[in-house]
Amino acid sequence: MGKNKKKTGKKAKSHPHVEDVDETVNKPEEIINSVNVTVPPKMSTDPEADGIVASPDDEGKDLSEGVDKQKVNDGLTVDTINPLEDKKAGDEMKELREEIERLKLELSHKKDQETPNEDFKNELANVIKERDEFKTQYDTLLSKISSMKSIFNKMKEAQKQLEEVQEQLTEYESQNLKLKKKLEATKTENSELQSTIVTLNTELENLEKEQESTEEVFLEYESRIEALEDEKHDIIEKHSKELNTYRKEKDQLNLQVQELMIILENNKQDISDLRTERDELRQALESHEKEKAVLKNSLNDLELKIEEVDNKREEEARERDQEVKSLRSQLDTEIETHNNDTEALESMKKQLEAMKEDASMKEKYEEESKQHILQIGKLRHEAIILNEHLTKALAMLKKSSDSESVDKELISNLLISFVSIPRADPRKFEVLELLSNFLNWDEDKKQQAGLISNNESKNSSAVSRTESFVSLWTNYLEKESEKD
């Protein structure tokens, strides 16, 4: 009982009181996890033989055997396993290496925490023997791995052995289920052990006091251990080359872990800063949203009023625009049809003159002239219909329009028609008169344009100036339609 108290007291110094018992109870879970990763071909399933809490030495032996046999099985199935299984085997090797390093650390930790009594030497000797056995097992493991390289070429034998391994795996799965049942039993015992934590804590406090007195004696034993380690150093040098590779990998992993920890700390600081900024922004957003809600209410009221006014104006403008657009389109089509008719008539006249000269082609030209006459009749009929529509639209426009404004397209059409009409045609004078009324020319400009002479300018005062531009425009269109 005294030995157990001293051991638990040393563990209490390096770990918290509550975590000590949890660590001893959770060791079966680690053993089961190692079995799941690297299942040895032979494992005792006797529940009485297996302890609930395995000692570090037993764990080291079991793990070394598991490593040995798992590496052999991995060597047998290298050529037949797919790339995913190769990756899994590599992961298992890494886990085995980590288990070996952990066991070494536990052994060194155990050396540091051993009590200075007569049993210490025996236990130290046992630990050294176990370490030597572990090293011999490790050497045998390496020799077996090197010997298995020659077997890789034998694919048929490897496949047979793979089938045997698969059968063993089924057995191991059944053993794994048994171990899981043991784990459940350990969990129940864990609940019972937690009840004893209070009593153990009191004992640990007493043991800590005893430990302080034994530390001085422990220093002497450490000096003796150092002498033994010097003797051990010659043996370790043989394995230093292989261990250096593992240490380099471990150092690289430690550096990566440190870098990741630094990155995590920086990220935590950044996250805290961002959270404070987010809270400030949320407060500002809430205040802005309140102001925005007030402004939205006022804006909605204003927008409703503006929409009502705009809708009224848009409806009026649309009606006027539609009327003007319809008039423009009709006017443009009328002008185009009129120009086409004039061109067709001129071409027909030329053709008729040519037909008089060529008597032999008379019949052919007569048929063509008849077709053209029919087309001209159709075009005139369409022009009459369009003129009727125009007169009706202009009459409606004359009634509805109060303003004397006309857009730029109308002015451009008037100018084009003025330029295209020949000088002898009286329509040119009418178009010029429309432009003068639209642009509100005075008498001087009209005289310069040739609309009125000096005598007519005196009599122009008697003419009524109240006649609007729209009325002149409608009269002009009516005259054009009558001529057509």
UniProtKB/Swiss-Prot annotation:
The keyword Electron transport does not apply. Its main location: Golgi. Pfam families: GRAB (PF10375). The keyword Repeat does not apply. Residues 1-15 have a biased composition (Basic residues). Residues 401-452 form the GRIP domain. It is found in: Golgi apparatus lumen. The modification Phosphoserine is found at residues 55, 64, 468. Residues 16-30, 61-72 have a biased composition (Basic and acidic residues). Keywords: Coiled coil, ER-Golgi transport, Golgi apparatus, Phosphoprotein, Transport. Residues 1-75 are annotated as: Disordered. GO terms for molecular function: GTPase binding; small GTPase binding. PROSITE patterns: GRIP (PS50913). Residues 84-383 form a coiled coil. One of its GO terms (biological process) is Golgi organization. The GRIP domain binds to ARF1, which leads to the Golgi localization of RUD3. Involved in the structural organization of the cis-Golgi and in vesicle targeting/fusion stages of ER to Golgi transport. Present with 7620 molecules/cell in log phase SD medium. This is GRIP domain-containing protein RUD3. It comes from Saccharomyces cerevisiae (strain ATCC 204508 / S288c). The gene is RUD3.
